[in-house]
């Protein structure tokens, strides 16, 4: 009986489209079809910091199909995305020193990965946050929410 409940919980978490920051870290995959493997990242407020581990599971190079993961307040998402285009590939499509950016990984190509540590005290419970890929044109399909729980 207990094992069937555990299996049910595991299956529900697999199909929820959400990734819980187990152990205060999150593994997110991006692919050549311009998709992340999740639409939501749940962060426990008890974490002092959490790590976002981004892995590009595709094979295309970063100048063609590069991906990153940028976290901003949802209200700042579009402006940060637009300003990132001007930064170009050399700037990881993130404006240098942009205070609206909570955290971001570097731009990675197929088979590459990067990680970034996020100070959870910078995330306010109740505030809406968005994570997205700032490579030009990708954010329409590659974005989700960060929720502090």
From Swiss-Prot:
Subcellular location: Periplasm
Keywords: Copper, Disulfide bond, Electron transport, Metal-binding, Periplasm, Signal, Transport
Domain of life: Bacteria
Domain Plastocyanin-like: 22-149
One Pfam family here: Copper-bind
Cleaved signal peptide residues: 1-21
InterPro entries: Azurin, BlueCu_1, BlueCu_1_BS, Cu-binding_ET, Cupredoxin
Stored CDD domains: Azurin
Cysteine pairings via disulfide bonds: 24-47
Stored NCBIfam families: azurin (TIGR02695)
Physiological role: This methylothroph organism uses azurin in the electron transport chain involved in methylamine/methanol oxidation.
Protein known as: Azurin iso-1
């Amino acid at each position: 009986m207990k094992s069937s409940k555990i299996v049910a919980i595991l299956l529900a978490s697999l199909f929820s489209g959400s990734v819980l920051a187990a152990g205060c870290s999150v593994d997110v995959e991006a692919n050549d079809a311009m998709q992340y493997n999740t639409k939501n990242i749940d962060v426990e407020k008890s974490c002092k910091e959490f790590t976002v581990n981004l892995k590009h599971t595709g094979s295309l190079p970063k100048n063609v199909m590069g991906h990153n993961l940028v976290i901003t307040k949802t209200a700042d998402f579009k402006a940060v995305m637009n300003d990132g285009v001007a930064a170009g590939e050399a700037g990881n499509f993130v404006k240098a020193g942009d205070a609206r950016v909570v955290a971001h990984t570097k731009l990675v190509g197929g088979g590459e990965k990067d990680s970034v540590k996020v100070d959870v005290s910078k995330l306010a419970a109740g505030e809406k946050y968005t994570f997205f890929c700032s490579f030009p044109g990708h954010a329409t399909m590659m974005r989700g929410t960060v929720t502090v729980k």
